[in-house]
């Protein structure tokens, strides 16, 4: 079946290349709302699925792009392993291809790294229907640029991802979540202070409801986690959450099902990537902070040019994440940053080397 599906995909891409058509790669559609508006004829990878190989001792798994993310995570859990960057699903049926194409990561990214850091190798189909392989199945030094790292966050605009090899990590021996009521500026300072010290700090979140609450997830050796929880309770008055409640909480942050995300879904949700030590921002709306201050979510009616200019002046960038009505002005682009203007030319040359006729030029990524 997979060989037939591969042939079908190859025929569709080759035909689109000949006819000058645009193809929009899709899996289960759980992230159709992400990025720019949908354009092009949908080409599903759902039938191209399956785990090709899994070597727990080598900490590597190779899967086809249409494979269910849930299926892969369950296979990893059986061996007490995980994707440490905690990819969000955003709905039932999320696929590995969508995970890679979106490049999104959950609370654990701040300590483990992003998805791109875990990609070892890929098999792709370019805009002419040719199959290409990059990278491998082990971490090693490579000569030149590791092309496989280009696929994460490319939103399907560079090539059709077929197979991907990913590094996995063992689950921690112990995990605990502590929390304390704290206003935003103090929370930002404390997150960065603790992150600079040898504590087993795995994730953090500040939820701006009422006076605000700071949540810290500790993960590592049992003795280290116990030492940290005791120290934080004594020094900062932090309380340890029930383990099941903590699991539900962090999943709600990862999947954006927490009440903060759904209570004001009539207004646009902005995502600001900033230096973690950036001071608290008064943007006139609601704020939720992750990644020790490096990722800030904001609900409110903001002027796109103003919020993007503010983020840039602080050394970061801003883009709308969810909104009922999106415009290109609301999305982050290389063109917004004068210092990276030269990269626009390089990016265009790179795209054309993989996709000369723009088969995958859907405009999802601007």
Where in the sequence are the language-model features?
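Short glycine-biased active-site loop of nucleotidyltransferases that positions the nucleotide triphosphate
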Residues: 32-37
């Amino acid at each position: 079946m997979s060989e037939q599906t591969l042939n079908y995909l190859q025929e569709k891409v080759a035909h689109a290349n000949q006819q000058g058509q645009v193809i929009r790669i899709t899996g289960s559609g759980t992230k159709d709302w992400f990025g720019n508006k949908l354009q092009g004829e949908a080409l599903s990878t759902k039938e191209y699925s399956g785990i090709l190989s899994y070597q727990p001792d080598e900490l590597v798994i190779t899967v086809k792009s249409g494979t269910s993310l849930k299926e892969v995570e369950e296979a990893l859990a059986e061996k007490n392993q995980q994707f440490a960057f905690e990819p969000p699903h955003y709905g039932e049926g999320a696929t590995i291809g969508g995970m890679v194409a979106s490049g999104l990561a959950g609370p654990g990214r701040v300590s483990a790294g992003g998805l791109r850091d875990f990609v070892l190798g890929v098999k792709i189909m370019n805009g002419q229907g040719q199959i290409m392989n990059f990278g491998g199945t082990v971490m090693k030094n490579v000569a030149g640029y590791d092309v496989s790292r280009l696929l994460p966050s490319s939103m399907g605009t560079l090539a059709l991802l077929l197979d991907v090899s990913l590094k996995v990590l063992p689950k921690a021996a112990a995990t605990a979540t502590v929390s304390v009521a704290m206003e935003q500026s103090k929370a930002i300072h404390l997150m960065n202070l603790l992150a600079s010290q040898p504590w087993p700090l795995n994730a953090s979140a500040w939820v701006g409801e009422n006076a605000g609450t700071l949540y810290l997830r500790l993960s590592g050796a049992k003795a280290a986690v116990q030492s940290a929880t005791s120290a934080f309770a004594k020094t900062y008055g932090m309380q340890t959450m029930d383990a099941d409640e903590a699991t539900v909480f962090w999943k709600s942050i990862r999947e954006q099902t927490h009440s903060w995300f759904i209570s004001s879904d009539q207004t646009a949700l902005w995502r600001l990537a900033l230096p973690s030590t950036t001071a608290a921002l008064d943007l006139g709306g609601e704020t939720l902070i992750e990644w020790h201050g490096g990722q800030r979510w904001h609900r409110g009616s903001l002027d796109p040019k103003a919020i993007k200019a503010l983020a840039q002046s602080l050394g970061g960038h801003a883009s709308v994440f969810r909104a009922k009505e999106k415009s290109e002005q609301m999305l982050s682009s290389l063109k917004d940053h004068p210092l990276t203007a030269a990269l626009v030319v390089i990016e265009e040359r790179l795209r054309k080397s993989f996709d000369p006729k723009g088969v995958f030029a859907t405009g999802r990524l601007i």
